[in-house]
């Protein structure tokens, strides 16, 4: 008898915003719900007080201070670094964290299944290498 294991990858989308609720955020909120993904939005001091999501989890500036992370208490206001609070929240319950911005509109295939299995190249050279950040699959060797 052979055992078969099925792993369900839990996904979450994390964004930060200082803006009012816009169509992009509404789309992420609705479509995340449809595909059973979590949606986490991290607000800031400038985020409107009446900001609310229908399905996702919104953390206001004040909500973040109540979290059990030291970073959430020391992270400066009005900083993109606050997105890290969303990552900390998401690491607890999710396998895949998808990062995007509130001004990006999700393309049609954005919500298709994701995998953590990727084709890679084996590095034979034992010398120092540099991975090019603009193309993570291209590797250049340094001699």
Question: Predicted segments — roles?
Answer:
Residues 94-107:
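Short beta-strand-to-loop acidic/aromatic patch adjacent to the donor-nucleotide binding site
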Residues 66-70, 107-143:
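Conserved catalytic core of nucleotide-sugar-dependent glycosyltransferases
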Residues 3-35:
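N-proximal low-complexity "stem/linker" segments adjacent to membrane-targeting elements
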Residues 44, 61-64, 100-103:
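Short loop/turn segments at strand-loop or loop-helix junctions that form parts
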Residues 18-20, 42-48, 64:
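Short, polar loop motifs at secondary-structure junctions
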Residues 40, 57-59, 98, 137, ...:
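Hydrophobic/aromatic beta-strand patches that form the interior of the parallel beta-sheet core
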Residues 10-11, 31-41, 57, 95:
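Short loop->beta transition adjacent to catalytic acidic/histidine clusters or analogous donor-positioning motifs
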Residues 49-92, 111:
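Active-site-proximal specificity loops/subdomain of glycosyltransferases
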């Amino acid at each position: 008898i052979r055992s078969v294991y099925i792993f369900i990858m839990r996904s979450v989308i994390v964004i930060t915003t200082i803006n009012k609720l816009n169509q992009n955020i509404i789309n992420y909120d609705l479509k995340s719900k449809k595909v059973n993904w979590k949606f986490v939005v991290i607000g800031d001091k400038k985020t409107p007080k009446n900001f609310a999501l229908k399905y996702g989890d919104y953390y206001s500036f004040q909500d973040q201070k109540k979290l059990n992370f030291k970073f959430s208490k020391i992270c400066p206001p009005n900083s993109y670094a606050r997105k890290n609070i969303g990552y900390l929240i998401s690491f607890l319950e999710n396998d895949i964290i998808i990062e995007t911005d509130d001004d990006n509109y999700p393309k049609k295939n954005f919500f298709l299944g994701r995998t953590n299995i990727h084709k890679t190249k084996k590095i034979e050279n034992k010398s120092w290498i540099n991975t090019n950040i603009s193309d993570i699959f291209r590797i250049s060797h340094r001699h």
